[in-house]
Structures are given as structure tokens and as C-alpha cells.
Amino acid sequence: MRTLEKQRKLKYALSAAAFCVLLLRPLHASFLIAPAVTTLLFTALPFGQTAKGKRAPDRAYRGRSAAAVLLALLFAGLFLIVWLRTKQLVSLRFFRWKEAFPLLLVALVGGAGSIPFLAGLLEAFPGESKCTEQAAVFPGPAGGKTVISREDRRLLFCVALVTVSVCSLSSPLYPFNDWVDANCFFTVGKSMLYGIVPYRDLYEQKGPLLYALYALCYPISHRSFLGGWLLEIAAAWAFLSLAWKSHLLLTGRRDPIFLFLTAALVYTAPAFLKGGSAEELSLPLLMLSFYYGLRCIFLNRELTEREAFLIGLSSGAVLWIKYSMLGFYLGFILVPAYRMLRNGRGLRLLKLLGLIALGVATASLPVLAYFGYHRALDSLWEAYFYNNLFVYGKASSLMNTFRGLASGMASMLTYNDATILLVLFTLVTLWREKNRTAALHVFLCFCFAFGLIYAGGINLKYYSEILCVFIPLGVTQLMKFCGRARETAQNAGEKAAETGSPEKACGDGFKQRPDFGRVSRIVIPLLFTLALFGSENSYMLLQKRSEMPQFIFAETLKDETDATLFNYGALDIGLFTTADILPSTRYFCMLNLPSEEMVREMEHYMRDGVTEYIVSRGLEVESPSYRLLQTAEFKDNGTLYPYYLYIRSTEGSKDAAPVQELP
């Protein structure tokens, strides 16, 4: 009995320490306020509540909890040291108290508050499942039935709406999404509606399906990302719905707190960046396949024909959005294929692979038909496949590949640490649950996805956002782990053994603190909303449009109905969007591509005055054909950037690009 008690304390301490690390995710001390308030509230609530007709927790329970708190503080301190070293806040000779003190404060509060916080969260929403003798708290797979009720749909939509509205710069709560990549996608997408063919007429590097999605956003709003905001809400709703179904599959319980934790961890990660990335929009596609894989493994069955076709359809969509994310599917198919071959089901496997290929072909046919009709298949191959594989990447040797993978892991620890922690936690817990097949499946999916993303040697902040597809399973495993360890679950199990009524025991266990449950139903959603402001984008909430260079320059160009423009020295800063201008040159902005042709063409644009205007960020234009018209400055996440708008000083030249007028 004493050994079990020690194990229980250790589980509490590890849970608290793990959650403490999650609390320390934000890079800025100001973002730690919401987690600190959260833990303080939940430290006070559980131990101060009493139920009708029942006494408060006895002295022994308080003593065990106090011991667990002290042990948790020890673990929190150890994690804090490692964390500060990782964030380079601690050196060998000095300690930056000004930067580290807020982290230390939250570590102490988080270490103590995580125990009642995690236990309380699981009791706040008892769910609607029926307990069984096998599991009084988590009944496990609900027979494969994961139907989402109307109430759940409303909850999912509300969570998606609030999350995207707070975390994405595309939201109306923010003045403008100034992320250069999102503006590139929007510019190419709207150009497609005017007959401009990507790659052939307008050079960019992402997939054509991504541009088609942004083309759908243009009719909603020509000069803002209102359409992009709606697109992100739809993607978040689809992703969270599939995550919810996977949680129902593994636990059989409706736990709204699962949605809150999952949404907060995925969309406040620094890898989320500013919203509208290819990775963010592809999350529901990967989550669909991941959910089907989990269902096959946990229910011990094979993929159905419908599931195989939909997996192929989703992978085909990912192929034409950003094919470097296809590594997930390479790892995904290995475990199901091995199980079928081991059971002598080779013909069945071939049939399913054929259906997957049919799904890929179905997704690819419209893309190939579009470029074939415009006689631009060669441009599609050169720009999207060849240049990205052999020009954009740096992995020219095996050593460079290993360097790219190491750099990618360091990037994940900095910008998407929650995913790494939860993947490791998932693998350990699945292995201890004797579910080795599921652990192997998750491991292969993660390794192949991670490998294909970073093997090319390029490492950008937002690359790891697609790996957030593993967060829902990690949150589910964390909740299961804490649920098995909490004291109320033990009491419910003991009462069930005495009375022979596990249903009654489960119900009594959840009703021990009804006041806490009622308070939590109000407090938790509020704290979830506050936690979303830990997003790196929240600093833009106080910005006005009139202060942003994109709108300052757009005001200057508002009377120009036939203006031509190209973006020099950087990716699309957003003037094409705010001024509603169509690009008139193939290289409309400076891409992250070591291309001599692009540099040569842009020098030609500047030398011969091809466009009427040039906009630049942080780089001055030195050309006799242009003169400086306007300047502006804007502080982006603490860094001050100068912006320049140039106007053609001559009448142009015979090489000037034809103007493509907007209606």
C-alpha cells in the first residue's frame, strides 16, 4: 500500500512538472500573467470547497496533497533550470534576474497549482459516459462510435471562432495581417481570378491549391484578410472536430477542457506565427488521416474502402498545398500495411493502396487540368517541384541533412516545445499501457513528418506548426494519466469495490465538490480566453491601421486606378492587398530563393523603370529611374523596420509591363 502511495505521489509530481513546463511556453514574461492567475485560482478553489452534507477533505488527504506539492516544486525547479538554459536566460557566470524572475514566479505557482488544477479540471466536466468495471473514470473506446452532437458542434464552433479571432492577425480584432507569406498567397490567389497563371505569369513557391483557397477569400474583401479569417475558422473547426472525435474514441467522454487545452496549445505556439500558413490550413487534412489510423489501431481493425479513399484525397490535397508535409503519410501507412501483410491480407492491402492512389488522382486532376489548359505544366514542374527540391533546399550531402534535422529539432524546442513534450509523453504512456502498436504508429508518423520537413536544410519558424497534429492525442493521454492518478478516482474505485456499483461510485466521485464544478464551468472558459492572449500576436491588438505603412502608402495610391508596383528586397509586405493592385511583373516580390534569374529580372525592373512604383522594407532602392516618394516606420514584435515607397522619375521605357486593370 505504501508503494502505491509513493507511485501516486510521483505521478502527481510528474503531472505538475509537465504542466508547469507547458505554462512556461511563452517567450515573453508579460504573457505569463494568464497562466499565473489560472494556477492561483485553482490552487484556492479545490481545497476550500465543501459539498452539501459532507466534510471538507480530511487531514490525511491534505497531508498527501501538501507532500505532492513540495515534490512538485522540486521538479518545477529542476525543469526551470533546464528551461532557462534552453532559452539562453542563464549563462555560466551570471543570472539575468530581470528576465528570469517572472519565469521563476510562475514555476513556483505552477508547480503548486498544477496538482489541484489538473485534478479539478477533470472533475469540472464529468461528461456523459457510463462507467464500467474496467475503468471508473475513463471508459475507453466507445465501441468506435464518435458521433458529434449538436451541442458539441456549437461548442467546437465557439472555440474555433474565439481561438482564431484572438490568435490570428487575419481577425477583425487586428488592423491587418502583415505576414509576408500570407500576403504572397493572397496576391497570387486574387491574380488567378483575373486570368494570371501561377508560376508562368507570377512566380511563387507554394502549391496551387493554397492559392486557390486564397482566391476564394478575395471576393469577400479585396483589401483585407476578412476572407482569410473565415477560412482559418473553418480549418480550425474541422481540425478541432476531428481532434474531438479522436478524444471520444479513446476515452468515451465529453471533456470540453480537452478542446480548451488543445486549441490553446496549437494556436498560441510561436510556430503558428501570424496566421494563414499552409501548415495551419493543412492541419485538418492530416488530422483526418491520423484519426482514421487511431481508430484502426485501437479498435483492432483494417481501414475501410471509404477511409482509404479519403486518406488519398487528403494526401493529394497536401501534395498541392506543400508537398514537404507528405512525410506524415509515409510513416502513417507502415503500421497498417505491416499488420495486413502479417495477417496474410496482401490482396486487401493492394486494393486499399489503389483506393489511396485514386484519392490522390482525384485531388490532382483539377490541378493538372488547370495548368494543362493554360499550357503551363512545364512552369508548374519547374517552379513548384524542381526549384523547391534542387534550388531552394541546402541538403546537398548527408552531413547537411543531419545538420538540417538537428537545426529543426532546436527550432521545435524553441517555437513548438509543447509538441515535443506531448509526443514524448504519448510514446511513454502508450508503451506503459502495453499498446506498443499505437506507440510505434505515432513514432513513425512523427519521425517521417519531421524528417521530410527539415531534411532539406531549410529551417523557418512556422515549419513545425504542422506537427501540432500530434497535440490532441498528447492532451488525451495527459488527461487519462492525471485521471488515473487523482485521489477521487481512487476513492471511487474503492467505493465501487465495496458497494458493487461502479456507476454510483463514479457519480459520487464527481459530485464531491459541486460548488467547484459550477465555478469551473464559468472560470475555465474565461481563463482559456485569457490564455489565448499569450499568442505572440497579441501586441498588435492596440495598433491602428493609420499607423501601419501598408495603409499609409495605400492612402497615397488611392487615386491611382492603373498603378503598377513591385516589392523589392523582401516578400510581399501587403501593399498589393491594401491598395488592391495586381502584379504586372512575374517576380512581384523578392522570394527566399537563390535564383540568378530573379535577381537579374529585378535589376531590370529598377534600371528601366518597368513599374510606376516600388515598395521596399529595410532596403533602399538605388536607381536613377526612381525617386523616394514616402517613408514610414513600424515596430514588428519589438523590431523597428523602415518602409520606403518610390515613384518612377522618368516616363518609363519600352520594356514597361502592360497594366492589368481592376474592374
Roles of regions detected by a PLM:
Residues 17-24, 306-325, 329-335, 362, ...:
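Membrane-interface alpha helices of multi-pass inner-membrane proteins
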Residues 43, 47, 116-117, 241, ...:
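Hydrophobic, aromatic-rich transmembrane alpha-helices
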Residues 97-108, 327, 450-494, 498:
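Hydrophobic/aromatic-rich transmembrane helices and adjacent perimembrane loops
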Residues 272-282, 460:
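Short acidic/glycine- and proline-prone juxtamembrane loop motifs at membrane-interface regions
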Residues 328-361, 486, 505:
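Perimembrane helix-loop-helix junctions
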